[in-house]
């Protein structure tokens, strides 16, 4: 008897999950129009002629605020299931969550100290 016989369905799933995107990309490559003209290369801006350049430089502060937001947004995603199952998890899970929150508070204090949260 073959040892991996229980994984046949999983192997079939992997093959199909790999084949479908590859076939979709190949079909697009074969059926897509090949013409390149000047009008297709223009920037599209709500059906109007673009005003100004396409490349706008943003202040790096926007990226710092976005990065700090993403970090604490992910924290919320991790803490929500813990909060829902708080009564069933026990003291050890509570201590682990406190350690996790402490690490994030230290990260926030570090970002604040480095001036990542100041706009000046």
Swiss-Prot record:
Reactions catalysed: a plastoquinone + NADH + (n+1) H(+)(in) = a plastoquinol + NAD(+) + n H(+)(out); a plastoquinone + NADPH + (n+1) H(+)(in) = a plastoquinol + NADP(+) + n H(+)(out)
Keyword line: Membrane, NAD, NADP, Organellar chromatophore, Plastid, Plastoquinone, Quinone, Thylakoid, Translocase, Transmembrane, Transmembrane helix, Transport
Topology relative to the membrane: Multi-pass membrane protein
Major subcellular site: plastid
Location of this chain's protein in the cell: Plastid, Organellar chromatophore thylakoid membrane
GO cellular component, one term: plasma membrane
InterPro entries: NAD(P)H_OxRDtase_bac/plastid, NADH_UbQ/plastoQ_OxRdtase_su3, NDAH_ubi_oxred_su3_sf
Function, in words: NDH shuttles electrons from NAD(P)H:plastoquinone, via FMN and iron-sulfur (Fe-S) centers, to quinones in the photosynthetic chain and possibly in a chloroplast respiratory chain. The immediate electron acceptor for the enzyme in this species is believed to be plastoquinone. Couples the redox reaction to proton translocation, and thus conserves the redox energy in a proton gradient.
Oligomer and partners: NDH is composed of at least 16 different subunits, 5 of which are encoded in the nucleus.
Protein name: NAD(P)H-quinone oxidoreductase subunit 3, organellar chromatophore
Encoding gene per record: ndhC
């Amino acid at each position: 008897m073959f040892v991996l016989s229980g994984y046949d369905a999983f192997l079939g799933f992997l093959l199909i999950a790999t084949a479908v995107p590859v076939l979709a990309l190949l079909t697009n490559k074969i059926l897509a129009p090949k013409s390149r003209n000047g009008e297709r290369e223009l920037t599209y801006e709500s059906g109007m002629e673009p005003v100004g350049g396409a490349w706008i430089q943003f202040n790096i502060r926007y990226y710092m605020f976005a990065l700090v937001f993403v970090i604490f947004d992910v924290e919320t995603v991790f803490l929500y299931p813990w909060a829902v199952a708080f009564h069933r998890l026990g003291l050890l899970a509570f201590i682990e969550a406190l350690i996790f929150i402490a690490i994030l508070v230290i990260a926030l204090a570090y970002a604040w100290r480095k001036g990542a949260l100041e706009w000046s």
